[in-house]
Swiss-Prot record:
Cited InterPro entries: IF-2B-related (IPR000649), IF-M1Pi (IPR005251), IF_2B-like_C (IPR042529), Initiation_fac_2B_a/b/d (IPR011559), M1Pi_N (IPR027363), NagB/RpiA_transferase-like (IPR037171)
This enzyme's EC code(s): 5.3.1.23
Annotated positions binding substrate: 51-53, 88, 187, 238-239
Pathway the protein takes part in: Amino-acid biosynthesis; L-methionine biosynthesis via salvage pathway; L-methionine from S-methyl-5-thio-alpha-D-ribose 1-phosphate: step 1/6
Domain of life, source organism: Bacteria
A GO biological-process term: L-methionine salvage from methylthioadenosine
Site note Transition state stabilizer, residues: 148
General function of this protein: Catalyzes the interconversion of methylthioribose-1-phosphate (MTR-1-P) into methylthioribulose-1-phosphate (MTRu-1-P).
Gene3D superfamilies to which the protein is assigned, alphabetical: translation initiation factor eif-2b, domain 1 (1.20.120.420), Translation initiation factor eif-2b, domain 2 (3.40.50.10470)
Record-given protein name: Methylthioribose-1-phosphate isomerase
Alphabetized UniProt keyword annotations: Amino-acid biosynthesis, Isomerase, Methionine biosynthesis
UniProt similarity note: Belongs to the eIF-2B alpha/beta/delta subunits family. MtnA subfamily.
Catalytic center residues: 228
């Protein structure tokens, strides 16, 4: 394991900037960007410079702290809060972090920065607890399939789905990972593979259409994914393609685990039909690495997320505990803790 922790969002108090690792440029180069205003944080979230539900929540919290430290009054901070919440509508952690910061808007810059630091620290601690609980579910020497990137890059640090993998390895279970490339943004190919290679964890890259065959051949022991929103009934919104993996896992009788912090659970959303699904521009689908791969004039769809119905989910792993079906009472019980 790499002894240097990977944290994609940092607040530089000396220069009053939010520093983010530009995830659009990985794995070719590691470039850190200094965001000097809340509007720059909003844009970084929109254009996927920083991505992953918990990570954008941390970035938003720091964006509001930054705006306050630069003299913004509460009314202006409330306007900035609205822009942040609407930057990406599916990930509930973003709205959760902004709501939490909003309760302290009138307390001054120091209080807001303290709260942003707390959101960051609590998320990393949650990821480590999720990792420990999830690692206990993995068979010895398991081959784990994951989708998108639910690692340190997507959180304050350590990761959710990849936190489970890291905790297993740290605990002496030499698991290996199959990473879906995750078209069209290639989070699996560019980010998950990069993270795991950095930590010395064996990873094999798959195109998105290979998982079913490898499951049929007995090469995959389980699926572990992250989440952008979990409804009260256990339906899970995550990166597009997750639903298809869950169907395949169910057909092949493989466990399908969802690892996410409690801030991803949205008990105000009754089921997956109420989760807004972000639609991104088709340019991201018809181009690859700056080159057009489809004929000019051919339209494309890009729903950035899908919803996995709760019957396809084996368990939801949060820092508060592991929940199995029926999810509604289990999640409600965890909420009462």
């Amino acid at each position: 394991m790499n002894p240097q922790p990977l944290r994609p969002v940092i607040y530089d108090e000396g220069r009053d900037v939010v520093r983010v690792l530009d995830q659009r440029r990985l794995p070719s180069e590691e470039v850190w960007l200094d965001l000097a205003s809340c509007d720059e944080v909003v844009q970084a979230i929109k254009d996927l410079t920083v991505r992953g539900a918990p990570a954008i929540g941390v970035a938003a919290a720091y964006g509001l702290a930054l705006e306050s430290r630069r003299g913004a009054e509460p009314a202006r901070l409330r306007e900035a809060s609205e822009r942040l919440v609407h930057a990406r509508p599916t990930a509930v952690n973003l709205a959760w972090a902004v709501r939490r910061m909003s309760r302290r808007l009138g307390l001054g810059p120091a209080a807001l920065l303290e709260e942003a630091h707390a959101i960051r620290d609590e998320d990393e601690a949650a990821c480590r607890r999720i990792g420990a609980l999830g690692a206990a579910l993995l068979p010895p020497r398991a081959s784990v399939l994951t989708h998108c990137n639910a690692g340190a890059l997507a959180t304050a640090g350590y990761g959710t789905a990849l936190g489970v993998v890291r905790a297993a390895v740290e605990g002496g279970n030499p698991v290996t990972v199959f990473a879906d490339e995750t078209r069209p943004f290639l989070q699996g190919a560019r980010l998950t593979a990069w993270e795991l290679k950095r930590d010395g964890i064996p990873v094999t890259l798959l195109t998105d259409n290979m998982a079913g065959w490898l499951m049929a051949q007995g090469e995959i022991a389980c699926v572990v994914v992250g989440a952008d929103r979990i409804a009260a009934n256990g339906d899970v919104a995550n990166k597009i393609g997750t639903y298809a993996l869950a169907v395949l896992a169910a057909y092949h009788h493989l466990p399908f685990y969802v690892a996410a912090p409690w801030s991803t659970v949205d008990l105000a959303t009754p089921d997956g039909s109420a989760i807004p699904i972000e639609e991104r521009g088709d340019e991201e689908v018809v181009t690859l690495a700056g080159q057009r791969i489809a004929p000019a004039g051919v339209p494309a769809r890009y729903p950035a997320f899908d919803v996995t119905p709760e019957p396809l989910v084996t368990a939801i792993i949060t820092e508060r505990g592991v929940v199995r079906r029926p999810f509604a009472p289990g999640l409600a019980a965890l909420a009462a803790r």
